[in-house]
């Protein structure tokens, strides 16, 4: 079977231990390094964590505690607390709507027996009976009357040792504090025309927004934090804090500081950013009515423009993040139009534009601080794409629009065909605009966002104007260039090659013939037959095989096998020490990792889906350890890998180890496994879905997790190449015999080839879906 390649890599990965030890011996050296931090260091140590520095944004930050303000009469805005801080007993604050509510608050010192005092309330002398029996706490009392000539009633006393009180107008009410510190809480009085109530404060006060009410309550109960006193307190409009003063010219280079070897340069630049989107439209195999993918791809664009009379050559790379996956299924027939996945960018997405030009600002862009940018917005509208069907009217994806708004700037690196460029990455947030997009002649309409079908709408590029400023640490001699670690550049170049190779591999999926794939999956592929398509010498082939094994040794599959081996060893040793432990239980613990959950069902909080998913993650390892005669997912994975390696024009010895390792981990992520017990089948997927059914009728039966775990230990595990839903669909539409059902359940390659040669659309579609899952 083709999966022999994975078994061989797992079995022989120890062969690279010697070369690893040699590399470790050569690299584990110590040497003394003396660092002279120079005048640009923040401390006595070397400079650390150079980054993009400050980044402007449009957020206005409202202060939590605004003040103090002197006694005054004014109409406070609704939704803001007045935090009053009186120094002595007497009237604290008063307010009225001049119709049906007069509210005043007085403060009484501790240890006051019942007596009558005279207070001036709203300009009138009033006799009020008061008392405060507390020996340590001051007492705030609300005095309320409902008519101009009425008498005052006392409400909402607050006993406080902080001498702080609060009042707020909000939602048709006047809110105050009541109770006793440190457990005081808010209360309220209903009133009409509350928004026109003028408040007169007889002491210093602060303003706190309602969004920070918890902080205000904390102040009431525990007191204010330490505040520096000033001699002159002048209220200032909050809007003045948002004013930013720009004193720099549009385009200039300023020396901020300089020593003999290094200098800090501030670069201010006007820029014109031009970018475009790229996309990939992949058609599925078959009769020509299905599309597998319509996706965004990174797009490079090079152009020139004039800045201050100087011609500038610029390079941009546009990419997207946070895409939304949509699909359309017109029906189950092979001639029904369908799109497996098409990407749309919306308000939860981001667009990244990496910008570089040939000016001095980008020559030494390695150590940068105080990076800021200010850019305009731009509208991007979608065009039309015709889905060319063999017969019938063509569906058309048309419309869609988003606007891009600047959301920040950071440093980045662009990769061209010849060189890597240190550049600026401008991040744009999106908002959806009119018109929505639709697929004409389908039920898809009125959706918002920009689909990947034709994002440029015939435009050569989109354009944004703006400016940026940064301070860069550069050599004092302009002829020198800041050194960059070569190893980083090499690794980044390898990542670029791997990215291109992954794209090529994914695009080759639709070109694989299924009948040839099944034949190839049955061949016993070893390492050298797998890599025979790569042009290289024998010595290079040996080195390449070693590199593949070295990389594969660190894969998640190899790590899982190692962990499983340790678990089985522990289970065996435990069984030897204690004869009362069942061997089946020990095996379950090693293979499924859920025996403890099954021991005490009442204490288990896991759902059946969680338990079956836990077991399913180990079933691939059980299948590798106990190979059956049927075809498995790794056979298909290895066959697809071999086919793509032979057809690839970009594969090389440097990229092969990463590709083989990724294929073992990422090909066919949605796997399902089954065990057969007489006429009953238990099937569980790695996504938590599970089925139990009878072979005779394909009728579902209750799923017993305990029994499934026991069968996993004692019975062979089989890859569900043809899963339960496909089998049931096949039986309902075509009818299959009992023998055919058992052969499909066992993934018999002979029966699979029969159905494929008969051009059975259900089986072909299932195999097509497995091939399309072989993506990197």
Curated annotation (Swiss-Prot):
Motif (YGL motif): 448-450
The UniProt record lists the keyword Repressor: no
Spike body and stalk (antigen domain) as annotated region, ranges: 248-479
Gene3D superfamilies: 1.20.5.170, 2.60.120.200
InterPro entries from the UniProt entry: ConA-like_dom_sf, Rota_A_VP4, Rota_VP4_MID, Rota_VP4_MID_sf, VP4_concanavalin-like, VP4_helical
Region (Hydrophobic): 389-409
Region (Spike foot) location: 510-776
BP GO annotations: permeabilization of host organelle membrane involved in viral entry into host cell; virion attachment to host cell
UniProt KW keywords: Capsid protein, Coiled coil, Disulfide bond, Hemagglutinin, Host cell membrane, Host cytoplasm, Host cytoskeleton, Host endoplasmic reticulum, Host membrane, Host-virus interaction, Membrane, Outer capsid protein, Viral attachment to host cell, Viral penetration into host cytoplasm, Viral penetration via permeabilization of host membrane, Virion, Virus entry into host cell
Site (Binding to sialic acid): 101, 190
Positions of disulphide bridges: 203-216, 318-380
Residues forming coiled coils: 484-511
Region (Spike head), start-end ranges: 65-224
Disulfide bond listed as a keyword: yes
Cleavage (site feature) positions: 231-232, 241-242, 247-248
One Gene Ontology term, aspect cellular component: membrane
Record family assignment: Belongs to the rotavirus VP4 family.
More about this protein: In group A rotaviruses, VP4 defines the P serotype. Some rotavirus strains are neuraminidase-sensitive and require sialic acid to attach to the cell surface. Some rotavirus strains are integrin-dependent. Some rotavirus strains depend on ganglioside for their entry into the host cell. Hsp70 also seems to be involved in the entry of some strains.
HAMAP family, per the entry: Rota_A_VP4 (MF_04132), Rota_VP4 (MF_04125)
Protein name: Outer capsid protein VP4
Organism: Rotavirus A (isolate RVA/Monkey/United States/TUCH/2003/G3P[24]) (RV-A)
């Amino acid at each position: 079977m083709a999966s022999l390649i994975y078994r061989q890599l797992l079995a022989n990965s120890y062969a690279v231990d010697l070369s690893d030890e040699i590399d470790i011996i050569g690299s584990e050296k110590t040497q003394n390094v003396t660092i002279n931090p120079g005048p640009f260091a923040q401390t006595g140590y070397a400079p650390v964590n150079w980054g993009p520095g400050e980044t402007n944004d449009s957020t206005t930050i409202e202060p939590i505690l605004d003040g103090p303000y002197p006694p005054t009469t004014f109409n406070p805005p609704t939704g803001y607390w007045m935090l009053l801080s009186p120094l002595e007993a007497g009237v604290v604050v008063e307010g009225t709507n001049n119709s049906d509510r007069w509210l005043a608050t007085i403060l009484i010192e501790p240890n006051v027996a019942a007596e009558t005092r005279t207070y001036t309330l709203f300009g009138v002398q009033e006799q009020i009976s008061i008392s405060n029996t507390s020996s340590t706490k001051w007492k705030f009392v609300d005095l309320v009357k409902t008519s101009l000539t009425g008498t005052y009633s006392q409400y909402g006393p607050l006993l406080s040792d902080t001498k702080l009180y609060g009042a707020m107008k909000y939602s048709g009410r006047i809110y105050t504090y009541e109770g006793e510190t440190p457990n005081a809480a808010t209360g309220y009085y209903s009133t009409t025309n509350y928004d026109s109530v003028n408040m007169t404060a007889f002491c210093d006060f602060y303003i706190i927004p309602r969004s920070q009410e918890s902080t205000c309550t904390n102040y009431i109960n525990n007191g204010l934090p330490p505040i520096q006193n000033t001699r002159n307190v002048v209220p200032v409009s909050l809007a003045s804090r948002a004013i930013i003063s720009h004193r720099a010219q549009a385009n200039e280079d300023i020396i901020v500081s300089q020593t003999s070897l290094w200098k800090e340069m501030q670069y201010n630049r006007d820029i014109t950013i031009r970018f475009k989107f790229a996309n990939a439209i992949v058609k599925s195999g078959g009769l020509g009515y299905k599309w597998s993918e319509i996706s965004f791809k990174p797009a490079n664009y090079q152009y020139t423009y004039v800045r201050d009379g100087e011609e500038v050559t610029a390079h941009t790379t546009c990419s997207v993040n946070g895409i939304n996956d949509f699909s359309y299924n017109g029906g189950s027939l092979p001639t029904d139009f369908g799109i497996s996945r098409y990407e749309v960018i919306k308000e939860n997405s981001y667009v990244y534009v990496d910008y570089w030009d040939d000016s001095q600002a980008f020559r030494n862009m390695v150590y940068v601080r105080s990076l800021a940018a200010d850019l305009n917005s731009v509208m991007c509208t979608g065009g039309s794409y015709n889905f060319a069907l063999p017969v019938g009217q063509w569906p058309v994806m048309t419309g869609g629009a988003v606007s891009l708004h600047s959301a920040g700037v950071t440093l980045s690196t662009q990769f061209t065909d010849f060189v890597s460029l240190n550049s600026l990455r401008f991040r744009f947030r999106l908002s959806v605009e009119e018109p929505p997009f639709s697929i004409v002649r389908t039920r898809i309409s009125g959706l918002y966002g920009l689909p990947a079908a034709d994002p440029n709408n015939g435009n050569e590029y989109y354009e944004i104007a703006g400016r940026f400023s940064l301070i860069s640490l550069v050599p004092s001699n302009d002829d020198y260039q800041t050194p960059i670690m070569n190893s980083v550049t090499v690794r980044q170049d390898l990542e670029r090659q791997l990215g291109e190779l992954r794209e090529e591999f994914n695009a080759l999926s639709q070109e694989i013939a299924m009948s040839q794939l099944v034949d190839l999956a049955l061949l016993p592929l070893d390492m050298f037959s797998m890599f025979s398509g790569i042009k290289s010498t024998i010595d290079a082939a040996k080195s390449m095989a070693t590199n593949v094994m070295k990389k594969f040794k660190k894969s998640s599959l190899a790590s899982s096998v190692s962990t499983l081996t340790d678990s089985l060893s522990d289970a065996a040793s435990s069984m030897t020490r204690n004869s009362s432990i069942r061997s089946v239980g020990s095996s379950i613990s090693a293979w499924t990792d859920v025996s403890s959950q099954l021991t005490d069902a009442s204490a288990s909080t896991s759902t059946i889906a969680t338990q079956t998913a836990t077991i399913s993650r180990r079933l691939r390892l059980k299948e590798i350890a106990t190979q059956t005669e049927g075809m498995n997912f790794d056979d298909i994975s290895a066959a697809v890998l071999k086919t793509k390696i032979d057809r690839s024009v970009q594969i090389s010895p440097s990229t092969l180890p990463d590709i083989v390792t990724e294929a073992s981990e990422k090909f066919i992520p949605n796997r399902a496994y089954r065990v057969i017990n007489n006429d009953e089948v238990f099937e569980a997927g790695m996504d938590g879905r599970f089925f139990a059914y009878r072979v005779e009728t394909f009728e579902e039966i209750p799923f017993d997790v305990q029994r499934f775990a026991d069968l996993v230990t004692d019975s062979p595990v089989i890859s569900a190449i043809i899963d339960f839903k496909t089998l049931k669909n096949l039986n309902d539409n075509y009818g299959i015999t009992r023998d055919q059902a058992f052969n499909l359940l066992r993934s018999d390659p002979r029966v699979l080839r029969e159905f494929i040669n008969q051009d059975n659309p259900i089986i072909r579609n299932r195999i097509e879906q497995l091939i399309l899952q072989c993506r990197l």
